[in-house]
């Protein structure tokens, strides 16, 4: 469900100005899976997912590869570098993005957008740091990464380790854990989680 929702909303990704957003959806009964990308930063084919969902997909594939709870941390780190690091389309677009930052931003990057937390994570993994998560931004990457792990039924207490692979921002950690507590309550049948 989360993957479909991400893909459906992705053409409107990162449009923060409400007037601009209203302009893009005006007169539309349904604005899921918009044909034309409206994201101001990057453009990918409609139906493709954002980097937030992609990091969750990387965890999902890591779990398929190795379900041993002790090994999943190293498998996940390896797969983050493989999916987002040097040689990937994400990394190629990061190089283009750095070029655009030096001059006036004129156009969207064609292809996926790598997030700050993922860039920091890759750098920290390559430096063999024990703490790999990004610290510069408060985003949902850690939550998205840990969602498949949580849904597989792993220990609730070990979620922080998974989230921290991608972010160690205190705000990101708190929000992610709060979301997991709400999901946990809902899964257990709480009337009003």
Predicted regions and their residues:
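Structured, active/binding-site neighborhoods that engage oxygen-rich ligands
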Residues: 1-193
